[in-house]
Amino acid sequence: MRKKLLITSIPFGTEDNTPLKLLEEANIEYIINPFNQKFTDEQLIHYIKDVDYVIAGTDKLSIKVLDSAKKLKLISRLGIGLDSVDLLHAKSKGIRVAYTPDGPTNSVAEYTLCLILLSMRQSYRSNIALRDGVWKKFIGTSIEESKIGIFG
């Protein structure tokens, strides 16, 4: 019998379908959130009742939702926080909970560098002016003239 997986996170597999291919290769039937927004409790209860696993976004997995999940063995939370999962209740029901604390690390670092460069070169201001039909040169500051520090 095929294992079933509910994916609440949105979007999932749209930019890169590698995770979906891996699930198919593992013969895991999956359901991707069809609502393009967080599930309500009622929607979660409907979808979670017959699944073995959940890849969860930030949807609230409450006691009521977990109680309706009769076959659930594992919740894998995308991202760094677990505050959307009632951990004590999950444990009492024998549901394992995992998460990806370092998952967004590289993306956050890359985005930070992007914002630094955009700020230094005033690209955002230039874009706004151009959208308003104004061609104005924003020179900004070059990296070679700067000392850049990142805290955090």
Predicted regions, residues:
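Phosphate-coordination loops involved in phosphoryl transfer and adenosine-cofactor binding
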Residues: 2, 72, 144-147
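N-terminal glycine-/charge-rich "phosphate-binding" loop or analogous flexible N-terminal tail
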Residues: 1-51
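Small/polar loops that bind or transfer phosphate-bearing groups
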Residues: 7, 32, 57-58, 100-101, ...
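Short gly/ser/thr-rich secondary-structure transition/capping motifs
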Residues: 34-39, 56-57, 128-136
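Short, flexible, glycine/charge-rich loop motifs used to bind or transfer phosphoryl groups or to couple energy/partner
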Residues: 19-21, 43-45, 62-65, 87, ...
